[in-house]
Amino acid sequence: MKKAGGQAQATICYTTSPVHTLDSFVELGHRLAEMGADELCVKDMGGFMPPHEGGELVRALVQKVGLPVVVHTHSSSGMSGMTCLAVVEAGASAIDTALSPFAGGASQPPTEALVGAMRGTAADPHLDLGALAELSDYFRGVLEHYRPLLNLRSLQTDPGILTHQVPGGMLSNLLSQLREQDALGRLAEVIAEVPRVRADLGYPPLVTPTSQIVGVQAVFNVLVGRRYGEITREVRDYVRGLYGTPPGPIDPELRQRVTAEAPAISGRPADLLAPELDRMLTEVRALVPQADVAEALSYALFPAVYRSYRESADRGLTPDVLTSIALGVVGALRAPRPAPAAPPRATSAWSQAGRTHLGTQRGWVDAHHARARR
């Protein structure tokens, strides 16, 4: 990648545990630099990195590792704006933000607010607030267009993350799993089980894929009624070392149960895999003759999803069309309607959604909502 002119940014996932300390993060930064990283990114996936700790971490990385440091956080807990200012003052070379229509909640802090907060300081980014306002006005329209598809929970601040430290995306997955099992009333038990499973697995940071590995096992432990009464395949692979070396030691009893059935591996897990790109290209070109390497990589990562996507695309159901249908259906279901004087004539939301080709997607949705309000 670097030979092709790219820049290698290596990520340090911020988390807290008995094995995650300032010194351990700096040591990881040194290892990443030795591997050839051009810059470091501190990823606060849960949005619970306090301003003072963020500042201390960035300052230590800049001074002791010597690489530029980017900070990526989320507004989930409400601290992100304060944390961003603290890390900039500590020497961060960049922070990730989002334009105000898409900021806050599970997203990043607003670009405009931080530009205003840093104006006149040594870290002034010299961005035109007027131009940013124009961009925000445009994307506010985009936001309204897709509002029917938004999960309102993802737009809100959740200070509870400061105590349970379960990132928003992971919490959504837990809710979905419990809803499927008709067990939403046991969410508190699962939330309490998550840190126990995480400790058993050596305190991995709760970020994809380990957040799903920990979360699913926590759900199993609660619903089965016995801890590790059923061990998921992903936990077994993790314990055996197929996801790399854990930050801390794995629970000895759990390790013994897993490795008694299949031995642990040593070394780099990817070295156990045979080269597969040529095979993937052959398989994907059986579906799409003109497929390139990018298509093959998509197929390799998500084979079932890719096949479904290609089958839908062949029928004309491209992402744009599917989005329009979803917008129409959700908009029809959510639109406020006055009590009718007489029984209304049945209307098919699908037939309405199929009329998107008569005009732009946004124009059709606006017209559809106007009809619903009449």
Regions found by a protein language model. Name each.
Residues 1-69, 85-92:
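Alpha/beta enzyme core
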Residues 22, 70-72, 355, 359:
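Intrinsically disordered, low-complexity regions enriched for glutamine and histidine
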Residues 45-229:
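Catalytic alpha/beta core domains of metabolic enzymes, predominantly
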Residues 156-160, 169-374:
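Terminal or standalone catalytic/regulatory effector modules within metabolic enzymes
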